[in-house]
């Protein structure tokens, strides 16, 4: 006599188990659907075949790129996946946020992770703009809380010391936050001169990143109002 039991398991799996008694082996179940995986466990008189069906995980459609800072949008990592709270994992999760910060002339660095408290430093245009608190609270904090859950006790913003002197070396050092992204696009950036309100920069790369460079320099160095590119 054939007995069947269907059980629905929460998550992305469904299992259907069919059992039958037989003397000459076990029943053969044929299914042409590649989303089914068959597992057979033969016994002397009883055989069981379990069919696991993995529900399809819907992905975002190709096309316009949506910022993970937007409400209701999870990061590129699976939203169900959580991580141990370490500096390396915090940095990994923030990789989904950085492209959007960099496009606005900013970035974020992980300063420390201690006793559930994550200290971050916003860079470039994100540092002192009026929306910096919104960026931290509505964007970065939301993504981190989603990935680290109750292990994350607090997120603190660390601020840079006030810039006292504007030099070519100081501006170049500040642009280090953008150089990895520029290099990924096959570009380069170097500050050639700083004279009063004028800053001349040798830049090769995408126009969108170039606008971010200009914003990063002006936000950090308030006395610079003109940033000129040369190749």
UniProtKB/Swiss-Prot annotation:
Residues 1-69 form a transit peptide. GO terms for cellular component: chloroplast; chloroplast stroma. Belongs to the NifU family. It is found in: Plastid, Chloroplast stroma. This is NifU-like protein 1, chloroplastic. GO terms for biological process: iron-sulfur cluster assembly. GO terms for molecular function: iron ion binding; iron-sulfur cluster binding; structural molecule activity. Molecular scaffold for [Fe-S] cluster assembly of chloroplastic iron-sulfur proteins. Homodimer; disulfide-linked. Predominantly expressed in floral stalks and siliques. Expressed in leaves, cauline leaves, flower stalks and flowers (at protein level). InterPro entries: FSCA_dom_sf (IPR034904), NIF_FeS_clus_asmbl_NifU_C (IPR001075). Its main location: plastid. It comes from Arabidopsis thaliana. Keywords: Chloroplast, Disulfide bond, Plastid, Transit peptide.
């Amino acid at each position: 006599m054939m007995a069947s039991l269907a059980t629905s398991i929460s998550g992305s799996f469904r299992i259907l188990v069919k059992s039958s008694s037989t003397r000459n082996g076990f029943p053969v179940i044929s299914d042409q659907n590649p989303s089914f995986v068959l597992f057979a466990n033969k016994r002397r008189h009883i055989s069981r075949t379990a069919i696991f069906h993995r529900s399809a995980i819907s992905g975002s459609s190709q096309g316009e790129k949506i910022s993970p800072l937007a409400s209701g949008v999870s990061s590129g990592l699976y939203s169900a996946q959580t991580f141990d709270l370490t500096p390396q994992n915090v940095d990994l999760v923030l990789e989904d946020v950085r492209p959007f910060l960099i496009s606005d002339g900013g970035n974020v660095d992980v300063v420390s992770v201690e006793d559930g408290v994550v200290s971050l430093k916003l860079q470039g245009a994100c540092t002192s703009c009026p929306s910096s608190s919104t960026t931290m609270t509505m964007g970065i904090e939301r993504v981190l809380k989603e990935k680290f859950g109750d292990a994350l006790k607090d997120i603190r913003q660390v601020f840079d010391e006030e810039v006292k002197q504007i030099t070519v070396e100081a501006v170049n050092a500040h642009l280090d936050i953008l150089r990895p992204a520029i290099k990924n696009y096959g570009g380069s950036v170097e500050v050639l001169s700083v004279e009063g309100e004028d800053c001349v920069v040798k830049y090769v790369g995408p126009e969108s990143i170039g606008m971010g460079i200009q914003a990063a320099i002006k936000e950090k160095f308030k006395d610079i109002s003109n940033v000129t590119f040369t190749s």
